[in-house]
UniProtKB/Swiss-Prot annotation:
PANTHER family: ATP SYNTHASE DELTA/EPSILON CHAIN (PTHR13822), ATP SYNTHASE EPSILON CHAIN, CHLOROPLASTIC (PTHR13822:SF10)
Gene: atpC
InterPro entries attached to this UniProt entry: ATP_F1_dsu/esu_C_sf, ATP_synth_F1_dsu/esu, ATP_synth_F1_dsu/esu_N, ATP_synth_F1_esu_C, ATPsynth_dsu/esu_N
Stated name of the protein: ATP synthase epsilon chain
Function in brief: Produces ATP from ADP in the presence of a proton gradient across the membrane.
Keyword Transport attributed: yes
Subunit structure, as described in the record: F-type ATPases have 2 components, CF(1) - the catalytic core - and CF(0) - the membrane proton channel. CF(1) has five subunits: alpha(3), beta(3), gamma(1), delta(1), epsilon(1). CF(0) has three main subunits: a, b and c.
Pfam families: ATP-synt_DE, ATP-synt_DE_N
GO CC term (a single one): proton-transporting ATP synthase complex
UniProt family annotation: Belongs to the ATPase epsilon chain family.
């Protein structure tokens, strides 16, 4: 049996996931990473990504994870994020509309917060890919 760790994923609205996990794959500003039990402690900024976790029962769960903070220590992994969604919770039409709006904002450039628009585009693309 694989070693596990406590995992808690929290959004402003709810506790998205709380339980034991064998591993979780996600993406930080430094790149893609995989967290296993007894991982060295660190804190990182998360970017929107399609993530995957393996529960203590060996069940694979895929989900969308928005920006946030990842805190890892030897006892647990805590993710505080803007949003987390299972594939069945994602409204594909809404995500496609968000993608279109972000692309339109980026094409204008004047008076547009480019970083914010790029972030919105990345988030929409990842949500669409998840469904």
């Amino acid at each position: 049996m694989a070693k596990t760790f406590k995992l808690k994923i929290v959004t402003p609205e709810k506790i998205f996931f709380e339980g034991e996990a064998e591993k979780i794959n996600l993406e930080t500003t430094e790149g893609k990473t995989e967290i296993l039990a007894n991982h060295s402690a660190f804190i990182a900024m998360l970017v929107p990504t399609n993530s995957k976790l393996i529960t203590d029962k060996g069940e694979e769960k895929k989900f969308f994870l928005s920006s946030g903070i990842l805190k890892v220590n030897t006892e647990e992994v805590v993710i505080l994020c803007d949003a987390a969604e299972w594939p069945e919770e994602i409204d594909k039409k809404r995500a496609e509309e968000a993608k279109k709006r972000a692309e339109e904002r980026l094409s204008k450039k004047d008076g547009v917060d480019i970083k914010r628009a790029e972030f919105a585009l990345m988030r929409a693309i990842k949500r669409i890919e998840m469904v």
